[in-house]
UniProtKB/Swiss-Prot annotation:
Pfam families: UbiA
Lineage: Bacteria, Pseudomonadati, Pseudomonadota, Gammaproteobacteria, Alteromonadales
EC number(s) on file: 2.5.1.141
Keywords: Cell inner membrane, Cell membrane, Heme biosynthesis, Membrane, Transferase, Transmembrane, Transmembrane helix
Chemical reaction(s) catalysed: heme b + (2E,6E)-farnesyl diphosphate + H2O = Fe(II)-heme o + diphosphate
Name of the protein in its database record: Protoheme IX farnesyltransferase 2
Top-level enzyme category: transferase
UniProt record similarity statement: Belongs to the UbiA prenyltransferase family. Protoheme IX farnesyltransferase subfamily.
Gene: cyoE2
Main location: membrane
Membrane topology: Multi-pass membrane protein
Tagged with keyword Cell membrane: yes
Amino acid sequence: MQTQDRFMSPQWKARFKGYVQVTKPGIIFGNLISVAGGFLLAAKGDVNLVLMLASLVGLSLVVASGCAVNNCIDRDIDAKMQRTSKRVTVTGEIAVGNVLAFGLALGVLGFSILALFTNALALLFAVIGYIVYVGVYSLYMKRNSVYGTLVGSFSGAVPPVVGYCSVTGQMDMGAAILLLMFSLWQIPHSYAIAIFRFNDYAAANIPVLPVAEGMTKAKLHIVLYIAVFALVSALLPLAGYTGIAFMAVTCATSLWWLAMALKGYRHDVDIQRWARQVFGFSIITIMALSITMALDSQVIKEQVIGQTSLFTLVK
């Protein structure tokens, strides 16, 4: 009874909530969608549920680990930013050593699941993505270079590739398109955040593009990267990995996102509101494409099966 009371106490609930928060559940959820999209794109309707579950759980734990370790690394700059000043690693509600141990334990568990159930290539991408995010981006590039976003975009693009390679076990054109597509998406998404959180980044002396080189250059880069993202996204249907439904969705969302980005050049634009709109629609875009590439891939598989069966009957 005492044990049950202890677990129900406000202190324990607050501590549990703190451990959940350092894993950044919103980021985990977004990555779950992209992992599933990559997996189902490669599976084309022939889904191994055990493999899919292992890919989702394993990669989610790896992402959670990276986020927790990032909280430990960033605690000094988080203290200077209004948005992050209440994090438990800043307030001291949970000891940094405990958060680090928790994060590393999640990583070991996540990588172990991927190693046991997926394949060497999927595991390799997960490891490289983790090293880039924690070791290269968080420890150095974020604090010291305007190119930090470009480096970080690679790790952000890894989850759908892990999902895809879990099925195929090879780095083919589909995996390459996904890697490039999601890397390109990360950049305008991140620059939009940096614009509407400009004061936070400036206070922490983080050299993101809007802070280091100004709004004009940041707006130009947002427009250019969205335009290239739209072209690269169209490669999936053009290369035969998805069908007309994905092409329709990618054209509609990408062009709308691009039109929204171009509004940043209006003389009467509210730059903060505009950046939030660009950021918000970036989430809608990548979610829509992740879901559509999974569903459209299955439709193509069914069409192929149907045509094969008909051919057999006629023969």
